[in-house]
Amino acid sequence: MKKLTDKQKSRLWEQQRSVNFQASCLLEKGKGPAEPDIEMLELGPSAPGLPHLCLIHRHLFRNEMKGAGELRTADISKGDIPFCHFEYIEKVGNELMASLESDKYLVGLQKEEFTDRISHYYCEINMLHPFMSGNGVAQRIFFEQLAIHAGYVLNWQGIDPDDWAAANQSGAMGDLTALNVIFAKVVSEARESA
């Protein structure tokens, strides 16, 4: 895989962000931010961390959510699945980001290994669920940017929202098989012509 320059990565992000954002919101069954101003969201750093995820969330929801980009201060769950206890979000989130850093932000991996690792980290950050709402869209943008820096693109178009929800539910129970299948469809190698 040929490594992209920073300029090529930025152009690729500019080409992908709007279309991908719309498809990402469909996975939330239309529950995305009302005024995200996605065109103004720059490609983040090649070494993102929890503060960058917070920045993405703040950018997306600043016009409609008090405390956008701030870590939640109450426990939440989805059905029977509890997310990380709010008092541990920062600690666990920073540990996850340190692990991602140890994995070199997934740079240099072949597609199959990249797919496995991004599924793992997506599931872990999903279980962290650092914000009161808007986690899914913010996470997907975070991982879209991570993928670009690693030489891949993510394309959420054509992913069924119910399949996505079921895959995330299975991941929460420790089975990443369905997430791996979806990410195998979503991930493709970034092209130099971007």
Predicted regions and their residues:
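FIC/Doc superfamily catalytic core
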Residues: M1-A194
